[in-house]
Amino acid sequence: MYTRYSYNPSLGRTYVYDNKFYKNLGSVIKNAKRKEHLALHEIEERTLDPLERYVVAEDPFLGPGKNQKLTLFKEIRIVKPDTMKLVVNWSGKEFLRETWTRFMEDSFPIVNDQEIMDVFLVINMRPTRPNRCFRFLAQHALRCDPDYVPHEVIRIVEPVYVGNNNEYRISLAKKGGGCPVMNLHSEYTHSFEEFINRVIWENFYKPIVYVGTDSGEEEEILLELSLVFKIKEFAPDAPLYNGPAY
């Protein structure tokens, strides 16, 4: 017989469920997706492992090879607000004008038995008036029909702001790249016009370039245009083969 002070197991009985067999459905799904993502990531990493043997430059201008600069001309262009002016038109005969040869370097800075890997068109822009506060804009196209006649002045539509040192740089290399032409010095000294047509434009794009400013006033811009040749160096930093001759 139970008294009021006796322990009766049927009175006030509580049930406690062990929670280790019950999991939140959201955490189960998230954990499964996380495991699947890790498995796919490991597979992708394994496929990319062979590429770790190669080195890629973030900027092709700073990649392997030697940069040789050929200054073509310097001149002043007046640009009106909200417009861009044509400064380079390789589709015509603009490279034959006198101002190009006036600032041409006396000797071509490329010696024999070297290969052109890439050609960069470099346009350096500087304001001629002091205490001016504006940014330079530029647009370019790499290909056009030989008979295409571009407009001298266009309206500003989706331009690119010119970056460091007010220098606009365009890679003219075609897909596949390279210009396997030797004896470049003799080609250039024989005839500059033939060198441009036969060597450069046979292997690289002809650009059309417009420049402008975001200023609300008419501005004078001093332009310096040059071609920078990325030259393949035939003396690698590390030997390709190991042996007694190296």
Swiss-Prot record:
Mitochondrion as UniProt keyword: no
Gene Ontology CC: viral occlusion body
Highest rank taxon of the organism: Viruses
GO molecular function per UniProt: structural molecule activity
Function: Major component of the virus occlusion bodies, which are large proteinaceous structures (polyhedra), that protect the virus from the outside environment for extended periods until they are ingested by insect larvae.
Similarity remark: Belongs to the polyhedrin family.
The protein's name: Polyhedrin
